[in-house]
Regions:
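Charged, alpha-helix-forming regions
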Residues: 1-166
Length: 166
């Protein structure tokens, strides 16, 4: 059973309002940096791949961070970071207060194939914030923020456990 099927089952019977990602999260591009500009350090530089491109001495994002690769073969690849990082050839999704970051991450991970299909461009494919901004995200109990966050938290707990098993 796919993660979306699980998410749909977990939301079954709950009032849900679908909102565009762009209306409930900040989509922010990274800062361009080349290997020659990097000052050797321990901060992962997250660019267009599945692993850090290199390591730098400063970060431009802290805490729980959702990153979507912006170009190349892995454009659209979603990753999760819980440490300071330097986002380069990618963009981040920072949910507003009505959406838990990890809930948003699970939803985007479920859409991984669709995100890859957003690629456009000639030689080097790209995925842009404008491509993912219209994605609809289910917000449970939208009129009761505390209940909404509690439901999201429980869904995250279950999906984290499910993901750890697969």
């Amino acid at each position: 059973m796919s993660e979306l099927s699980y998410l749909e089952k977990l939301l079954d019977g709950v009032e849900v309002e679908w909102k565009t990602l762009g209306s409930i999260a900040e989509l922010k591009r990274g800062t361009s940096i080349t290997k020659k500009d990097v000052i050797d350090g321990t901060i992962p530089v997250v660019a267009s791949g599945r692993t850090p491109a290199y390591y730098h001495n400063t970060s431009n994002r802290d805490g729980q961070t959702i990153v979507i690769a912006g170009s190349g073969a892995y454009a659209g690849f979603v990753s999760w970071w819980e440490e300071p990082i330097f986002v380069s050839d990618a963009f981040t999704v920072k949910p507003h207060n009505i959406l838990l970051p990890r809930y948003c991450y699970h939803f985007l991970m479920n859409m991984q194939q669709q995100l890859h299909e957003f690629k456009s461009g000639g030689g080097v494919p790209h995925v842009y914030p404008r491509d993912v901004s219209p994605i609809l995200i289910p917000i449970p109990c939208p009129d009761t923020p505390e209940k909404s966050l509690a439901i999201q938290s429980e869904i995250v707990r279950i999906l984290d456990k499910f993901t750890a098993l697969t």
